[in-house]
Amino acid sequence: MRGVVKELNDDGFGVLGNVLVPFSAPGDEVEILKIEKVKKAKIASKWKLIKSSPLRVGARCKVFGRCGGCSLQHLSYDYQLEFKGERIRRLLGVDVEVIPSPRIFGHRNRIDLAVTVEGIGFRERGKWWKIVDIQECPVFGKTSRKAIERLREFIEEERISVWNVKKDEGFLRYMVLREGKFTGEVMVNLVTKEGKLPDPSKYFDFATSIYWSVNRTKSDVSYGEVESVWGREFITEKLDDVIYLIHPNSFFQTNSYQAVNLVKKVSELVEGERVLDMYSGVGTFGIYLAKRGFKVVGFDSNEFAIEMARKNAKINKVDAVFDVATDREVEVNGFDTVIVDPPRVGLHPKLIKKLNREKPEVIVYVSCNPKTFARDIEKLEYKIDEIVALDMFPHTPHLELVAKLIV
């Protein structure tokens, strides 16, 4: 089968007839050599590029096309933004500005590297059992090269057994790297099964903090029961004038440079004085707003996230209040603005009913999933007053939406 790729679907796959062509560009002339059926989709698992699209650029990553991390690195950044804007236009029927990421390489502040008999790196696209060995991750930056080199030395010199994914054997499973892009602080977290970890401190002497996490379950996860091995308990990140503590088991926006624009945009859309910060996490929005004089109350169902939010409030010397509660339990009356930043599944139906009943003046909806955002907007008795998209995830199809909703 031979032809010209017409467009990209929402997942960033090129479309040629009824076949999806990964890592292709609109305007590419391709010859499909092998097709595999994945669920209900036909995927070109092997294809040849006959003539390149003018939208193509050289990928900076040496393993691009195999690694499952980035899927759009072969496209010009201008076109990536155009593609994301068109995706939102198709979904919502409105033109939305897509704010570009201030940096498109070295922007990620976290990567979870599998440590296996095949190598150190990420899973191959569509193959959970295969790991693509890497020397450096360009979207994380130069610290990744140093950390991977030191990890190889640590494994070899200390004779550490590493993960055999297919057999589910081996001691050392993951290395999670986190970096404060505005502070330069680095955290190395080594994730293992039960056993004894040799002292890693001399190998990772560039790190601010070294942790050992033990995964005692059968689940394939890059976290566990944590123990501080060396250095500080937390690293820090700074967004404008706000400091945030980073712990191995706490969530933080993965693109620090664009996160500055995100918190600024949310603060611009807030009205009134009293703000309810739903799904507050570690207080990313709430503390930024409290620093600017808003009276903030935040809730999250994750106890550890709330513990971190309280610590962040304390170090920033703000009076924001954070408590543990589910989205179904929180009372929304008495607030001028309600911020909602739900997980990818979107808002709980009971919360939607509560918002429709109590009618806070303004809702600021932050979404990492445009599809569930569109679904929730249909159910909320509000209209979109302002909406913008932020490219938090360059070289992927994903983006963040921020909308101001009014009655």
Curated annotation (Swiss-Prot):
GO biological process: tRNA methylation
Enzyme class, first EC level, given as a word: transferase
Positions bound to [4Fe-4S] cluster: C61, C67, C70, C137
Pfam families named in the record: PabTrmU54_TRAM_dom, tRNA_U5-meth_tr
InterPro entries for the chain: MeTrfase_TrmA_AS (IPR030390), MeTrfase_TrmA_CS (IPR030391), NA-bd_OB-fold (IPR012340), RUMT_ARLMC_TRAM_dom (IPR048845), SAM-dependent_MTases_sf (IPR029063), U5_MeTrfase_fam (IPR010280)
EC number(s) on file: 2.1.1.35
Cleaved signal peptide residues: none
Record keywords: 4Fe-4S, Iron, Iron-sulfur, Metal-binding, Methyltransferase, S-adenosyl-L-methionine, Transferase, tRNA processing
CDD domains from the UniProt entry: AdoMet_MTases (cd02440)
Ligand binding (S-adenosyl-L-methionine): Q253, Y279, T284, D300, S301, D327, D341
The keyword Iron-sulfur is annotated on this UniProt entry: yes
Active site: C368, E400
Gene3D superfamilies: 2.40.50.1070, Nucleic acid-binding proteins, Vaccinia Virus protein VP39
Catalytic activity: uridine(54) in tRNA + S-adenosyl-L-methionine = 5-methyluridine(54) in tRNA + S-adenosyl-L-homocysteine + H(+)
UniProt entry tagged with the keyword Lipoprotein: no
GO molecular function, one term: tRNA (uracil(54)-C5)-methyltransferase activity, S-adenosyl methionine-dependent
Protein role: Catalyzes the formation of 5-methyl-uridine at position 54 (m5U54) in tRNA.
Family per similarity comment: Belongs to the class I-like SAM-binding methyltransferase superfamily. RNA M5U methyltransferase family.
Descriptive protein name: tRNA (uracil(54)-C(5))-methyltransferase
